[in-house]
């Protein structure tokens, strides 16, 4: 994902060709375009990771079935429309720690997801999956959500709904 003039790209292409996998590089356009394409790529990655996470959580939460998530990941990564390198990584992680008990459900964002969402806003392009994946990362970092306390309080106040207390 290179952003460069055609002349500059012609000079650096032999080096990039040596380092990149076959057909794994290209000139995206003028200077800056490579960063832009990589930013959107990473935003898409946020959405894909979130979808995998949600899917595996649904599978794990099933009361009806005792599912082997590692086995499912292995099957999906070899013969499924959702196969990907990210799924390869999920299979590897689930093989060594099937419940992922060594991890906290905490995910930082490195900036590219935010930049992608800002670009979507600036250009008026709906990007609900990428936006929600970014917001899910924000939520993962909260010990206690004041917003959800307000929601619980309002539900209690207007409808007498049950709430959990400290």
Regions found by a protein language model. Give the residues of each.
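A conserved hydrophobic position in a structured secondary element of the catalytic/binding core
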Residues: 4
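Phosphate/pyrophosphate-binding betaalpha-module
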Residues: 7-18, 25-28
């Amino acid at each position: 994902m290179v952003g460069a003039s055609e002349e500059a790209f012609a000079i650096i292409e032999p080096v990039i060709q040596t380092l990149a996998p076959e057909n794994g590089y290209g000139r995206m356009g003028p200077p800056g375009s490579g960063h832009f394409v990589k930013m959107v790529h990473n935003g898409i990655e946020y959405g894909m990771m979130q979808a995998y996470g949600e899917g595996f959580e649904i599978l794990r939460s099933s009361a009806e079935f005792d599912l082997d998530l590692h086995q499912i990941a292995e099957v999906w990564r070899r013969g499924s429309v959702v196969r990907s390198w990210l799924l390869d990584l999920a299979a590897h992680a689930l093989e060594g720690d099937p419940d992922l008990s060594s991890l906290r459900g905490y995910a930082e964002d490195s900036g590219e997801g935010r930049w992608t969402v800002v670009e979507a806003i600036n250009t008026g392009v709906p990007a609900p999956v990428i936006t929600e994946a970014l917001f899910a990362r924000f939520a993962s970092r909260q010990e206690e959500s004041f917003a959800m306390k307000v929601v619980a309080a309002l539900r209690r106040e207007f409808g007498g709904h049950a709430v959990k207390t400290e």
